[in-house]
């Protein structure tokens, strides 16, 4: 069950971003930290680099939007960033852009046990994620993949 505050924050952030030619890649809300933390990752449409100025401008806009919405009635920390190394691959474009890059895949096997594999991203088709592990291609059914994350070349 989704938190209604998170849902509302995602809508506010997405609408605010769209008005500036940006899109929200990810939004995390941590109500248990003091102060509350809201982390928003943005990128330009189509995927272009986001500058520090873009993050600062978006931070100002979304902060004002959150204040006006009265969703959060206590102090909060707002963190705006852009995707970078170590981030999750999610879109088809991500998988095309980072072909050949080192990744770590978290997936479940037939017994529903979570496993990881590390290698180079080879391809993502409609049915499989293919990774190159020491020169051998390993196929993981897409429905079993939980996350795919960029890693450093050393692992």
Swiss-Prot record:
Keywords: Cytoplasm, Ribosome biogenesis. The keyword Cytoplasm applies. InterPro entries: Ribosome_maturation_RimP, RimP_C_sf, RimP_N, RimP_N_sf. It is found in: Cytoplasm. The keyword Cytoplasm applies. One of its GO terms (cellular component) is cytosol. One of its GO terms (biological process) is translation. It comes from the Bacteria. Required for maturation of 30S ribosomal subunits. Belongs to the RimP family. This is Ribosome maturation factor RimP. It comes from Prochlorococcus marinus (strain MIT 9211).
């Amino acid at each position: 069950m989704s938190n209604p505050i998170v849902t509302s924050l995602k809508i506010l952030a997405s609408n605010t971003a769209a008005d500036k030619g940006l899109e929200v890649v990810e939004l995390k809300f941590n109500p248990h930290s003091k102060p509350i933390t809201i982390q928003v990752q943005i990128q330009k449409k189509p995927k272009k680099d986001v500058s520090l100025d873009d993050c600062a401008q978006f931070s100002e806009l979304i902060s004002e939007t959150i204040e006006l919405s009265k969703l959060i009635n206590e102090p909060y920390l707002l963190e705006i960033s852009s995707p970078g190394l170590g981030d999750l691959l999610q879109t088809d474009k991500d998988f095309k852009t980072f072909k050949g890059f080192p990744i770590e895949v978290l997936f479940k096997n037939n017994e529903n046990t979570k496993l990881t594999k590390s290698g180079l991203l080879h391809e993502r088709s409609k049915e499989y994620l293919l990774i190159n592990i020491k020169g051998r291609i390993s196929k993981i059914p897409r429905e079993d993949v939980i996350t795919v994350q960029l890693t450093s070349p050393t692992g």
